[in-house]
């Protein structure tokens, strides 16, 4: 079959990133109004276009630096707002972009951040001003959940009370840092203003020394056995200058579970937290209960999580699967999304080595399978780890290429990255901030998180098992070798999914590196070699209607529709550019059999019921009004740009 090149629906756009655009919230409920604001001077005759993927939902002219928009009442959708001007010859110039997430539950598309400093240092810093600045940046990244690390007093007694039952306003955490209750609460309030959820952190089995004074029983302890056969309580050693080591309890012990349920009640009764981030310490080897029976530790997490969820079913519950330890038990029932702290020397997932980019795929694949394709993955992955721990490091900057390539791969695979708080996370001790982001990285992350949010339905709308596609992609370019996933040194790596009537092909740029680890431990990853005008041929399944690309590295993530040629199963086009990551989306035509008796659609491509289409004037692909068709109420589609048109006198079969 031979098809001609498609026509572009609009003149090519240029990119002038002159406007800083913000929204009033990180995410929105269906039907909730979005308020936009432009910081700076907006060009005359600026228009805004709201897209869901390629489809234009609405276009309007802007007459003020602040305006509102109400997205369609469809749950779990991402949109990109493009601000643009149009010259006399029809050329568009895009002057700003920002994403919008419409989701009733934040855990459907979690974008997780953190906070870990609750001190004003004897009033030497304006902590409340810092809180506002930090949360405004997280809001610009559409961070919809925030983990509170090391906010608590003691792990076994997170809330500290005075003798009269009132909250102690200042206390010291395990590292002897001061924590101000006022600032914990102000962080929560500021996050809620932006529609974010506030999640408190604690271990599932940790207690300080002398915890018996607070009601922790010796018979709850988790034990180990030394070479002589002597049993002793397992513990996590900490610096001698800290308040205590952490002594481990048996997480399935009913007494300990009930004790921690009471402590969680105290947390929720005194702080407006929205959930519990449960932590563990990975594989502890052979461990025992107080009767010297072996404890299968990863299985012991199940009753603990079940009890926490039953006690507070309305609250978010998340647990860390450290290097994959306990994944099967953790993600199956009670948690709301998958959270994986990944390192470089362990691997509880199988497949590639834990430090490799390829292992990120293995993690998501296993999480999808263990959660019955129901829960998405967040990586707690510490970039530039060795540089951050080196007192003789040459500089104190986070390496931008290391961050962007790691995020590109994580996002393309369908995950997200816990990395942003008041600093970039580079060590497992969240309060540590040895490396800082420069302004360029901060701005580039805005585009990356816009991209993650705007295209969330294509990136994270389905699991790998449901959508993974072994795309066949070739190029005639002499300076580019294209290979399929997993990444290979000095190549352009592709990863693909088939989602409904679209093939989504990600191009990830490894062309100038043989470092295939996401960790960039020493902060030495070089910037990629920008590749432009790459001739590409992709194998496709049927006639193609439209082709478009988008990248967080160019045009603020805005859509660029491309021309193409199709010869049978070969789709040929020119890929405009790949710096770190470019996404190409192939949209297939809908195949119909227009007979005298009825209209038929091929098996396997019919849309499923989700929302009702109410009668309205319909449009064809070129936005020209169609009057000789009926709209059918009661037929549901997945996104606002799709519809089913049946000619007069026809039947839908």
Where are these regions (language model features)?
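An acidic-aromatic substrate-binding cleft motif
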Residues: 94-154
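Active-site neighborhood of glycoside hydrolase catalytic domains
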Residues: 252-337, 343-362, 369-372
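C-terminal outer-membrane/trafficking sorting elements
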Residues: 594-653
